[in-house]
């Protein structure tokens, strides 16, 4: 097993999705469907194909078993009986049972009016009560895969009709609400079955993109020359009595959740660099002494991403050594990072493990028979059971949703600490690049992310404990899997917004950290040279150097510690600290060797020297500030993985460092955008997969891409496969 199981899985799924999207086809055989294939059909117009001889033979044998049993003395549910709590009825003519089933199930709320609006890729633009088209496409491919296992007595002709709908871009408009996922997702699947029947009162989208239109199922079938399907014995039940909608949407959810959870490790690296963290908490020894696989994987990813950083210290783990290669933070303060950074491997690790388990549960469900009753191809028997109960999916998506909340809580805590100048080790309030008394850059993001996290936390509550008895008390327990999956997808949207906001803020924080650190590096070198001539003669060069170093240290600490001040005041306070240390040995730091050299100045001379130093600092800062905003040098100082994510935002998306009030859009300004517009650009890049593409690429570049496919194509429960 890979030492990085979630990352290995994510890279495998990412590669497979690319492969299938480029190929344009997915061959279904009933036992090796994976979440990447579901996403390829749902989101990338990949076409499912069923042409395997064994599959077709299974379908034929299954229907033959049903036909023989139909004529026998055994009572078969849904063939000789009514449905659910009405199964005690025995219709004289069972040929109309499928029609009766469709009538009882096609009861969802869809306000269908004003449909003559071309160019809509999703019916939700017109019918907000409907499922997204991608969910319906995913549902269709999953139901096909479940049915072709040969246990549902579905004819090959019926499977071909479903495949033809997908190929012709005919997507049923399915109500968003109304499924309790007990006897499967009856109601959503009935609208797909109704489309096959050519119902004039079920609507579909036909075509995609600008050519999409909404028409009736009857008209859509007519346009492609497809005859309405007359459902055979038990076929109506076989189409609807399964977990396909829950499993399909859970597949999309887990794919996105895996990517967002991994991205949180990259974001934590960016925040660590923005905060100039002391990252000995990533040392392998810590994970070895508490060997949870998720914790170990998180730490390993973050170490690789931070490699080469000049903004963090302690990457090699020496607890007593906090020296950075660049002066990037004050010497005082906490000797170790606060919990949102220091315990991030311990916080994120369990989420990695839960999401891996959720993926496993969903993968099994994709390749399971979900129906009742089931035909046994080996014995010819028909078995009544409850494989339609989607509780495995509920279990999976509730783990995912809880994990998303935990990831969101960590990112929220990191971000609000990074924006707060009283906690961020020397960065300006709200990450303002200009004077913080009038400019508030990321303050609104702090509020936004709190709002997102509040909603995310609300959504993380369990759905399964809200089960209501339904359908004549026959479905007294029901999984609510689709409902739980819907809220999980909403949680994914919210976490995506949080990731976008935190990425924007972290890039700003890294820019500011580098801008101020490089300013101090430059100005203190020139200041040391200018002040050296003022020191009295007769002292050893080593003593003079020590005195100047102590004064420079005082200046740097004053600069970082007064990040909440405007530039003019910050320069004054730093100048005072510098001169005080030169003139008063008691102001030297206690952990430095005793200083023997100091200036003997009158109060007036001290003020004059302070003014000179302040003026020097002010001129140097404004020059450096302007040059840095014109051409930031941040990428030269950050880790290899962080650099890739930073440059994705700065170069690929063209999102610049926020310079302050001068960047606010106003009438007549050209090319300026609100902070929200830039965050929205990042969010769009998260939704369409571009950010994870960059993450995956750099993950391989920094040595994290080794490993196999993690079993994503392995057959689930192979001992039950039908050969």
Swiss-Prot record:
Pathway: Secondary metabolite biosynthesis; Phenylpropanoid metabolism; trans-cinnamate biosynthesis; trans-cinnamate from L-phenylalanine: step 1/1. Keywords: Cytoplasm, Lyase, Phenylalanine catabolism, Phenylpropanoid metabolism. It is found in: Cytoplasm. The modification 2,3-didehydroalanine (Ser) is found at residue 183. This is Phenylalanine ammonia-lyase. GO terms for cellular component: cytoplasm. Belongs to the PAL/histidase family. (E)-cinnamate binds at residues 241, 336, 342, 372, 443, 471, 474. There is a cross-link at residues 182-184 (5-imidazolinone (Ala-Gly)). It catalyses: L-phenylalanine = (E)-cinnamate + NH4(+). Contains an active site 4-methylidene-imidazol-5-one (MIO), which is formed autocatalytically by cyclization and dehydration of residues Ala-Ser-Gly. One of its GO terms (molecular function) is phenylalanine ammonia-lyase activity. It holds the Pfam family Lyase_aromatic. SUPFAM superfamilies: L-aspartase-like. Phenylalanine ammonia-lyase; part of the gene cluster that mediates the biosynthesis of squalestatin S1 (SQS1, also known as zaragozic acid A), a heavily oxidized fungal polyketide that offers potent cholesterol lowering activity by targeting squalene synthase (SS). SQS1 is composed of a 2,8-dioxobicyclic[3.2.1]octane-3,4,5-tricarboxyclic acid core that is connected to two lipophilic polyketide arms. GO terms for biological process: cinnamic acid biosynthetic process; L-phenylalanine catabolic process. Its EC number is 4.3.1.24. It comes from the Eukaryota. The lineage of its organism: Eukaryota, Fungi, Dikarya, Ascomycota, Pezizomycotina.
